[in-house]
Amino acid sequence: MSVTSSPHRSGSVAVIGRPNVGKSTLTNALVGAKVSIVSNRPQTTRHRLLGIATFPEGQLVLVDTPGLHREQKRAMNRVMNRAARGSLEGVDAAVLVIEAGRWDEEDTLAFRVLSDAEVPVVLVVNKVDRLKDKTALLPFLAQVSEGRTFAAVHPVSALKRKGLEALVGDLLKLVPEAEAMFGEDEITDRSQRFLAGELVREQLMRQLGEELPYATTVEIERFAEDGALLRIGAVIWVEREGQKAIVIGKGGTRLKEIGGKARLQMERLFGAKVFLETWVRVREGWSDDEAALKAFGYE
């Protein structure tokens, strides 16, 4: 991607929004690599992570976050909201991602959180390619912008990589003149071990869809290099025996499909052959247990 911005700039940008507006898809598109998992299921992103987007003119350290939502019943929901709010600490700017043609209470919540942070906010109106009536876009932008201040407004399609060049140009203007914080080849601050767990979780959501129990997480129990081979052991945690049966599937076919597709994604991302083993285990009530959440890596 070619952008015009001089001199060299570098800074951090929080990517904020309600669930399922395409924050992770946008982060991946700007980075140029898959650092955040994506699915059609809301609240796919559960952890805060950095995506590092490097251009000739500068570097943007994108803080991808869980979607801000009103659900607070489980400890896991509260932890995810804390992670999203905490991502604003020390950033130079923020991106508010919304869906073209839609603004609801959770979008308002996200905007209020950003208003309290006192950083410049760029509004990114994503999924414009899905808007059936294109003439409705400008009135929608005017409606959303009324009474709200944005440093810039960008309609984009993160999935189709449309409108991103102008967005990058404006974001680089909002970060300070500085040397890059990360090397050119670095794309995330997260370890391969963490990414392996996320790729298994992504396949859980893709393969099970609406059948997937909400209280499902993945723990990487083993991650070891064996010559040119990566040996990875992944535990899928659920809360009840019935949920375990759903994940495993008849004769283990569903678990095999999940593991096979996750392994291919790992090999593509890590550039190495992967031997992946997966198990499903039960831990009752883990999603509402602060100690269990901490043990599973939730911030």
Curated annotation (Swiss-Prot):
Region (G2): 43-47
Region (G5): 156-158
Cellular component, GO annotation: cytosol; plasma membrane
Membrane topology term: Peripheral membrane protein
Location relative to the cell: Cytoplasm; Cell inner membrane
BP-aspect Gene Ontology terms: ribosomal small subunit assembly
Region (G1): 17-24
Top-level lineage group: Bacteria
Single annotated GO MF: small ribosomal subunit rRNA binding
Domain Era-type G: 9-177
Coiled-coil parts of chain: none
Domain KH type-2: 200-284
Pfam family, one: MMR_HSR1
Residues that coordinate or bind GTP: 17-24, 64-68, 126-129
Region annotated G3, chain positions: 64-67
InterPro entries assigned to the protein according to its UniProt record, in alphabetical order: G_ERA_dom, GTP-bd, GTPase_Era-like, KH_dom-like_a/b, KH_dom_type_2, KH_sf_prok-type, P-loop_NTPase, Small_GTP-bd
Keyword annotations of the record: Cell inner membrane, Cell membrane, Cytoplasm, GTP-binding, Membrane, Nucleotide-binding, Ribosome biogenesis, RNA-binding, rRNA-binding
Region (G4) location: 126-129
Subunit structure: Monomer.
Job description of the protein: An essential GTPase that binds both GDP and GTP, with rapid nucleotide exchange. Plays a role in 16S rRNA processing and 30S ribosomal subunit biogenesis and possibly also in cell cycle regulation and energy metabolism.
Family: Belongs to the TRAFAC class TrmE-Era-EngA-EngB-Septin-like GTPase superfamily. Era GTPase family.
Name assigned to this protein: GTPase Era
